[in-house]
């Protein structure tokens, strides 16, 4: 299992950063996501399910993303999602925003990638922690970059 927790401060309002995580804007921060369609409940509800299609090179992967936790208050916003990728990995992601002041937001990105079968566990053991850290850092940079455009 791979786990991570990283945080950064973004020089803009919590509302602007949070808007990037709305369904209509998700492709801005996750450019490899080609489809993100709500199929159950409302996007701001625990238990909401989305059909998501992700492109990795020439390969397309489609899976169901379930919202496990959702909080939207003035000073803190949090969303936790989970999905199984390629029948091999169970991925859980948590995006937390904490209002520091009117123009600064703490962004915390944490998650875990767990092998659900022998192939998944073997691939995680063979994978590089360095490359996973790079993906996490690139995502955080992308969120920061997109937030500054708003």
Where are these regions (language model features)?
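Glycine-rich portal/gate segments that line the openings of hydrophobic small-molecule binding cavities
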Residues: 38-86, 138-150
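Short acidic, gly/pro-rich beta-turn/loop elements at beta-sheet edges
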Residues: 16-18, 29, 60-62, 75, ...
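Beta-strand/loop substructures that line and gate deep hydrophobic ligand-binding cavities in soluble
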Residues: 82-137
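Short, surface-exposed coil-to-beta transition loops
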Residues: 2-5, 60-65, 88-94
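Hydrophobic ligand-binding cavity/cleft-lining segments
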Residues: 1-45
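Hydrophobic pocket/interface hotspot
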Residues: 16-21, 26, 50, 67, ...
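Short strand-connecting beta-turns/loops that link adjacent beta-strands
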Residues: 13, 43, 72-73, 100-103
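Generic structural detector for well-ordered beta-strands
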Residues: 7-11, 37, 53, 66, ...
